[in-house]
Amino acid sequence: MAKGFTFKQFHVDDGGCGMAVSTDGVLLGAWATLPKQGKLIDIGTGSGLLALMMAQRTAPAPCSIIAIELDDSAADAAAKNFSNSPWSSSLHCVKQDIQQWNRTQPKNNIGNIICNPPYFNFGLQADSQTRATARHTDTLTHDALLQSITHLLAPEGIVSLILPEYEGRQLIQAAEKYGLQCQRLCEVKSTEKKPVSRLLIELTSSTVKSAPQKEALCIHDSGQYSAQFIALTRDFYLKL
């Protein structure tokens, strides 16, 4: 039996990656606004899940998707997953730190960026170095991430992210210092009675200021996946 996770149109082998395929990643990949044209960058691609999801969603009008990954094992896994997918010609994995790669790129040339960033600050580390790198901001602080985004993002460009609620609201505040504003925000709960656990965040470099479009999503309803969750993710999960 193949290792990893099989979706409707592709398979993700996440062995050796710091973070396995997760609901967070699937939510972000299904929710993110599609690029209108040009390149899409996936920062910290891990196993390549987000890049693959965006490749599936943009397949009718393919765009170039560049996935950046610092960890050697994860980058190798992503490259293999890309080559085994139906969209191998559109997917490219770069094994490099985003800040180093950033220095080789022209300013304000990327229309769409997607990222499931690390969110734990210093303190208790994960049970392996690879997992720690994927989950902790020690190797990529949110300020460093925002600096890279500001350099890369084209005028009117869009950035899509997912974070725990507290870290997400902190990042939205920090983004304002870099000329990025939140234009779309989805509060995610596991059930209606639970507190908000995740924020799906869309930032833009647009200079037109307005209140963000607010959305809400409950993953479960009466012990089953909710109609909202099924509608959002049914193009990917095999059993939906």
Curated annotation (Swiss-Prot):
* Entry keyword set: Cytoplasm, Methyltransferase, S-adenosyl-L-methionine, Transferase, tRNA processing
Name the predominant localization: cytoplasm
List the SUPFAM superfamilies hit by this protein, alphabetically. Answer: S-adenosyl-L-methionine-dependent methyltransferases (SSF53335)
GO molecular function terms here? nucleic acid binding; tRNA (adenine-N6)-methyltransferase activity
Listed GO CC annotations: cytoplasm
GO biological-process terms attached to the record: methylation; tRNA processing
Family statement drawn from the similarity comment of this UniProt entry = Belongs to the methyltransferase superfamily. tRNA (adenine-N(6)-)-methyltransferase family.
Compartments where found? Cytoplasm
Reaction catalysis annotation: adenosine(37) in tRNA1(Val) + S-adenosyl-L-methionine = N(6)-methyladenosine(37) in tRNA1(Val) + S-adenosyl-L-homocysteine + H(+)
Pfam families, sorted: MTS (PF05175)
PROSITE patterns attached to this UniProt entry:
N6_MTASE
Instruction: Mark the transmembrane ranges.
Output: none
What are the coiled-coil residue ranges?
none
Function per UniProt: Specifically methylates the adenine in position 37 of tRNA(1)(Val) (anticodon cmo5UAC).
Catalytic EC class: transferase
Q: What is its EC number?
A: 2.1.1.223
InterPro entries given for it?
Answer: DNA_methylase_N6_adenine_CS (IPR002052), SAM-dependent_MTases_sf (IPR029063), Small_mtfrase_dom (IPR007848), tRNA_Adenine-N(6)_MTase (IPR050210), tRNA_adenine-N6_MeTrfase (IPR022882)
Q: State the protein's name.
A: tRNA1(Val) (adenine(37)-N6)-methyltransferase
